[in-house]
Amino acid sequence: MKQVRLLPSAPVRAVCALAVAALAGCAQIPRDPIIQQPMTAQPPMPMSMQAPGSIYNPGYAGRPLFEDQRPRNVGDILTIMIAENINATKSSGANTNRQGNTDFSVPTAGFLGGLFAKANMSAAGANKFAATGGASAANTFNGTITVTVTNVLPNGNLVVSGEKQMLINQGNEFVRFSGVVNPNTISGANSVYSTQVADAKIEYSSKGYINEAETMGWLQRFFLNLAPW
């Protein structure tokens, strides 16, 4: 007896493939870092020496004798003292109340006078609404990270970015920082506080079993997106 193998039709296969792709998309959580620029930069090649053996060296690495070592070129490093403490509180409320009363008599025809001669009508209505809301947040982040100058703006400000990775047991911790630094705010110890950095972006994230345990399952996220409540 010849066996006949039944295969699903092309539309059925397409629907199944689409469903699998949708579930796979639900299984993935967007984890794009907020800092998209490069985390480091290489300094350009120094200029060739025009007078070998002279005291003055026009190369990139040359620094004047009495000049400090603060960063000012691409590839220089700077220490960021992260000291962020942000507190926010918000509260709101609304209360409305409206009432109304109406009394009136209804004139009736002569042949209905015996039934509705003294008919009076009244109406009353009330509308009341009360709502309150509140939110609060407190964030504290302290630490240090050394970053690299990735660009020098025409006004002399430094675009910096850097990354620090720490592997602790089964988790990989990431600290990323980027921003624009005014060279005048850099201290003699070659450091600056994060509160003095413009356009600062600070990111602290992790990868590992602990982070996965804190993440909602893909099937639960799928039904959460479909639930109407």
UniProtKB/Swiss-Prot annotation:
Pfam families: FlgH. InterPro entries: Flag_Lring. A lipid is attached at C26 (S-diacylglycerol cysteine). GO terms for biological process: bacterial-type flagellum-dependent cell motility. Residues 1-25 form the signal peptide. GO terms for molecular function: cytoskeletal motor activity. This is Flagellar L-ring protein. It comes from Burkholderia ambifaria (strain MC40-6). The gene is flgH.
